[in-house]
Amino acid sequence: MRETNSGGCYQRRARRGKSGGRIEQHLVGAKLQTRHPERDVPNHPGHAGDLQTGRTGDFEVDSISYHVTATPGRDVIEKCRANAAANRHPVLVVPGDQLLKAKHLAEDEGISDRVTILALEDFVAQNVIEISVEHGNDFYATLQQIIGEYNRRIEEAETDMALKIELL
């Protein structure tokens, strides 16, 4: 499959909708690890639940709890509510075509003012730009770095290597 995102062209071997959110989760983890190299950003399999692993979200950075999902529902909104009640700031990252759904769910549940909801594509693209500027790299080199980290995370935590991404 060939897709174009705001960071460049890539090939993803997994079919759209078949990853169960694992692609999205590992891409955010790779982005966070690349953005914060001094931190150890945990790498859990995509099926590992937050409660079972004692996490407040898929990723925790200081007082921020990141939740990553391919299909937002009331369950992730409830997790965001619990984060806010515990004085953590929830950030919900979803595919761009799910952004409005996530925002409507947050509004319906009355927490839209206490959660940041971002499109995955924008989240990654903004960080590609910021990291590139900070380190004096071109955007493609930074994207290569993030995808390299993503593929490392897939190899470490998943059994389905079809989830790996190849930059073209």
Language-model segments: residues:
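Interdomain/boundary linker segments immediately adjacent to catalytic/signaling cores
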Residues: 1-22
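Catalytic core segments in nucleotide and nucleic-acid processing enzymes
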Residues: 15-168
